[in-house]
Amino acid sequence: LIVKRIPCAEMVRFGKNGNDATTLAVRLARHVTKNNNILFCGYHGWQDWYISKTSMNGGIPNEISNYSHRFAYNDVESLENLLIKFKGDVACIILEPISKVEPICSVKCKHCKISCDGFLKKVRWLADKYKVVLIFDEVVTGFRWSIGGYQEVCGVTPDLACFSKAIAN
């Protein structure tokens, strides 16, 4: 049923929480691409690659944070700058299709949390251009906006998607 409803779903793997889902997605992207760097925006749990870039980074070796790079939500230029800087060694782009932690849009509007000016379509295009796995973290958005996740609403199909919360409650 899930495979029929979610645009990117060809297979489904269940885990116990959203943190495990995003960890597995990033690990899979690294395995498939043989690349190291992760480009992200938004919140993605407590795994070392993400939390190493926050103020709660105690106990995480610097070497881990060297492979994680934050870009600004709704800012295509900040993402492409990272894709250029780490070209040939980017495993994935992971983001929440609607950001709950990136409150300011750097494009035109203020306090924007929803994609502006085709942002998600541009992210998809950049992922294809640079041969990078695109992951939507739909832990919060999945099944709340649509049975097919926010990807169904916005018309952008990621390579991988992570769902949690609404599917279990």
Regions flagged by a language model, labelled:
Residues 3-92, 99, 109-110, 118:
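PLP-dependent aspartate aminotransferase-fold enzymes
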